[in-house]
Amino acid sequence: MDEFQTLKQNASWDISEDANDTPSLLVVILDANPASWYSLSKKVPVSKVLADITVFLNAHLAFHHDNRVAVLASHSDKVEYLYPSIAPEQKVAEVDPTKEANTYRKFREVDDLVLSGMKRLMSSTDKVSRKTMISGALSRALAYINQVQNKNTLRSRILIFSLTGDVALQYIPTMNCIFCAQKKNIPINVCNIEGGTLFLEQAADATGGIYLKVDNPKGLLQYLMMSLFPDQNLRKHLNTPNQANVDFRATCFCHKKVLDIGFVCSVCLSIFCEPRVHCSTCHTKFTVEPMSKKLHT
């Protein structure tokens, strides 16, 4: 039964460190690709998944009176704030004051804005695309954290709900975001509900976050509360999920293949699975003759 124990056996509990009652900022990035949500709906209702996520957000807010939450939607062609709303008129219009008067106002505000925002994004999509603007969402999340931390003392972390696979063209901007989060000591946690993503797996490993693969989406809330609810200060004393084998291979920009050996552009660092005359990203021309000689030696 040792594997079911949550607390570490020999954890040195530093009372002075953990007594620091610093509030926490949780920035959530929701994959809002409609095609991915449609695929997930065959296993579990979309309303059930979103309800579990909003319950998790409310639990974070309830844990400390100064805890804060921000929610961004990573759509197929844009990134949008769901909470807090950047448009005051949208905030007033979408939060119904007559609903459940006994509910804590901030809980109701988060629920209404997140659910209505996701519904609006999915219903407004008229084309099917298997991509998501994860690099743009990470950039905006880091910018928001930097803005908030300049005014308040907070422990910040990012949580990504992933349903769509990697987009090869976003490799470099995603890696730039990972290095920025690593420098700022901001963990990137990933809850992979559907599909697989090498980029985000590497992001969690590089920033000291948690990469959690959800095998049964019907129990999403239990996954979230048991594995992703504690902040980085408490995780030192818990047996949190770890990544035994992290796949550090890159994806080629031309055919989106996972490579063991590839060809890298010396200018923009784009990766290709075969020799090319010029780089399709920065249009740099390569000297093919010396390269072909090296390949045959």
Curated annotation (Swiss-Prot):
Biological process terms in GO annotation: nucleotide-excision repair; regulation of DNA-templated transcription; transcription initiation at RNA polymerase II promoter
Q: Where's it found, cell-wise?
A: Nucleus
One GO cellular component term, please give it.
Answer: transcription factor TFIIH holo complex
Sorted alphabetically, the keyword list is: DNA damage, DNA repair, Metal-binding, Nucleus, Transcription, Transcription regulation, Zinc, Zinc-finger
Report the GO molecular function annotations: RNA polymerase II general transcription initiation factor activity; zinc ion binding
Function of the molecule: Component of the general transcription and DNA repair factor IIH (TFIIH) core complex, which is involved in general and transcription-coupled nucleotide excision repair (NER) of damaged DNA and, when complexed to TFIIK, in RNA transcription by RNA polymerase II. In NER, TFIIH acts by opening DNA around the lesion to allow the excision of the damaged oligonucleotide and its replacement by a new DNA fragment. In transcription, TFIIH has an essential role in transcription initiation.
Quaternary structure note: Component of the 7-subunit TFIIH core complex composed of XPB/ptr8, XPD/rad15, ssl1, tfb1, tfb2, tfb4 and tfb5, which is active in NER. The core complex associates with the 3-subunit CTD-kinase module TFIIK composed of mcs2/cyclin H, mcs6/cdk7 and pmh1/tfb3 to form the 10-subunit holoenzyme (holo-TFIIH) active in transcription.
Question: Belongs to which family?
Answer: Belongs to the TFB4 family.
Q: What is this protein called?
A: General transcription and DNA repair factor IIH subunit tfb4
